[in-house]
């Protein structure tokens, strides 16, 4: 028998499972399968780009462990994907993050030894980006990984996420549904799938409150990780057949339903993506079609957020019986 022990944590990234949704699919004539990125080593899809962006910069000779200072604006999950990589490789990491992101994110980032600077929540991700640029300008040997602009972001999804979906569905996937944060997942995986089958439909998901990709204005919303309020550089908008808008409330309700009815504890953006996928699978023209929806992160990262507000209060007020 050969040994199957990973040499380090980086070898645990990817090859996440696909699972059918069965009980939140009322009225669906198509099928919906979820790609569980919540089962990555650090519980989110961003583990893939944490790995790819650092590895890519190393291979190009742009950064060196122990010498370079990595800086990145993040809504949390990319920061965590970078933080566990930085810890494993020996980099100093400085992150800027809007103060509106969940408390779990702050704690996890600090647990991995990252330095964290909070930015004005009203300025959204733009504020975090500006702060990161300011810090880089005055920090020696600094390097901004730039997830919104870095080609290594969609590249890893083209090389891994897309092929995994194709293989996992036996090439039978008809539509990809993905929330758009940086646009890396939908661009990379979507491009790969479209090359395998030109008829595959690619659906983006964005918050109704900040529907920039649909021509709307940026605005505050509760779906952490998507709807950055601008069109990211890595996003290939021409790939997308349709952008589905989902409200924060709908996303939260669906995330709750996924836990209660499917046994899947996921974040708010997974709720948004699932709500969009179910809506698509209910359309008469999609009868018999298979939609793969990306669930970007695990629900435990949102315990302090609006997603679990009522349950948290209930739990805090419990008494011994």
Swiss-Prot record:
Transmembrane segments: none annotated. Belongs to the cysteine synthase/cystathionine beta-synthase family. One of its GO terms (biological process) is cysteine biosynthetic process from serine. It is found in: Cytoplasm. Its main location: cytoplasm. Homodimer. Its EC number is 2.5.1.47. This is Cysteine synthase. The keyword Amino-acid biosynthesis applies. NCBIfam families: cysK (TIGR01139), cysKM (TIGR01136). One of its GO terms (cellular component) is cytoplasm. Keywords: Amino-acid biosynthesis, Cysteine biosynthesis, Cytoplasm, Pyridoxal phosphate, Transferase. PROSITE patterns: CYS_SYNTHASE (PS00901). Pyridoxal 5'-phosphate binds at residues 77, 181-185, 269. One of its GO terms (molecular function) is cysteine synthase activity. Pathway: Amino-acid biosynthesis; L-cysteine biosynthesis; L-cysteine from L-serine: step 2/2. It holds the Pfam family PALP. InterPro entries: Cys_synth, Cys_Synth/Cystath_Beta-Synth, CysK, P-phosphate_BS, TrpB-like_PALP, TrpB-like_PALP_sf. The keyword Cytoplasm applies. It comes from Oryza sativa subsp. japonica. Its cofactor is pyridoxal 5'-phosphate. It catalyses: O-acetyl-L-serine + hydrogen sulfide = L-cysteine + acetate. The modification N6-(pyridoxal phosphate)lysine is found at residue 46.
């Amino acid at each position: 028998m050969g040994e199957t022990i990973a040499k380090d944590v980086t070898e645990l990234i990817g090859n996440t499972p696909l699972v059918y949704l069965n009980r939140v699919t009322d009225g669906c004539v198509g099928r919906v399968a979820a790609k569980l990125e919540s089962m990555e080593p650090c519980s989110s899809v961003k583990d893939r780009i944490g790995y790819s962006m650092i590895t890519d910069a190393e291979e190009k000779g742009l950064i060196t462990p122990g010498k370079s200072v990595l800086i990145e604006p993040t809504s949390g999950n990319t920061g965590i994907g970078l933080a566990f990589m930085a810890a494993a490789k020996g980099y100093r990491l400085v992150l800027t993050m809007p103060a509106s992101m969940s408390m779990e994110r702050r704690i996890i980032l600090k647990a991995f030894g990252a330095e964290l600077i909070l930015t004005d929540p009203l300025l959204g991700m733009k504020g975090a980006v500006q702060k990161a640029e300011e810090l880089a300008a005055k920090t020696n040997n600094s390097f901004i990984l730039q997830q919104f602009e870095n080609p290594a972001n969609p590249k890893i999804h083209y090389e891994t996420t897309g092929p995994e979906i194709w293989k996992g569905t036996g090439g039978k996937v008809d539509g990809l549904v993905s929330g758009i944060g940086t646009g890396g997942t939908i661009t990379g995986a979507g491009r790969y799938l479209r090359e395998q089958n030109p008829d595959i439909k690619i659906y983006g998901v964005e918050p109704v409150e900040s529907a920039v990709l649909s021509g709307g204005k940026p605005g505050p919303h509760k779906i952490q990780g998507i709807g950055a309020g601008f069109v990211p550089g890595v996003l290939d908008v021409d790939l997308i057949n349709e952008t589905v808008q989902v409200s924060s409330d709908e996303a939260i309700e669906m995330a709750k339903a996924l836990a209660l009815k499917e046994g899947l504890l996921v974040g708010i953006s997974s709720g948004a993506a699932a709500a969009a996928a179910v809506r698509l699978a209910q359309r008469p023209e999609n009868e018999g079609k298979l939609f793969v929806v990306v669930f970007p992160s695990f629900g435990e990262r949102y315990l302090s957020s609006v997603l679990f507000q009522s349950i948290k209060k209930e739990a805090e007020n419990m008494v011994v019986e």
